[in-house]
Amino acid sequence: LVKTSLVLTQHLTTLRKNIAIVLQDVFLFSDTVFNNITLGDPSISLAQVIQAAKEVGAHDFISALPDQYHHKIGERGGTLSTGQRQLLAFIRAYVYQPALLILDEATSSVDTESELLIQRATEKLTAGRTSIVIAHRLSTIRKADRIIVMEKGTIIEQGTHEELLALGGHYKNLSDRQYFNQEA
C-alpha cells in the first residue's frame, strides 16, 4: 500500500507539472505579482517571469504597478481588473510550459482591450502543445486545429473553423450572431 501510494504520488506530481489550467475566475493570493505567477516555485526566476509577461503582453501593465513584479496585490487580486487577473494566469501557465493546457472561458468577462491581449496570449501559449479551450467567444478558437461544438453535453459538430462555417449548422449560426453583434 505504501509503495502504491508513493508511485501514485510521484505520478500525480509529474501530471500536475505537465498540466496548466487558466480558469474564468482566476484565483490569486494576497501576495506579490511574482509569487502569484510562480506559486512559490524557486526554480522560476524573475527574468523568466518578465520574459513570459512580455510574450503574453502583460509586461506594460505590471511595470506600471507601484512595485512592478514585487507589487502586493489584494486578496483574490481585488486591486486588478478582470483582464489583468486573466493575464497573470496566462503568465503563470507560460512559465510552467505545460504539455497540456486547459483554458476555460478565459475571455468571458474581460474588456475588449484585454480580450485582444488574451487572444494573442492564447495563440502563443497553445502553439506546439495539446490544448483544450472551452469558449463561447468564437474568436478565441478560430485558429484551432479541431473545434468540437457541444450542446447539452453532446457533440453536435466538429471540424476546423472553415469546415464548420461551410457546414452551415450550429457553429455557423453562432458565428453569424457574434459577428453581427460585433458590427452593431
Regions found by a protein language model. Give the residues of each.
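ABC ATPase NBD coupling module
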Residues: 6-20
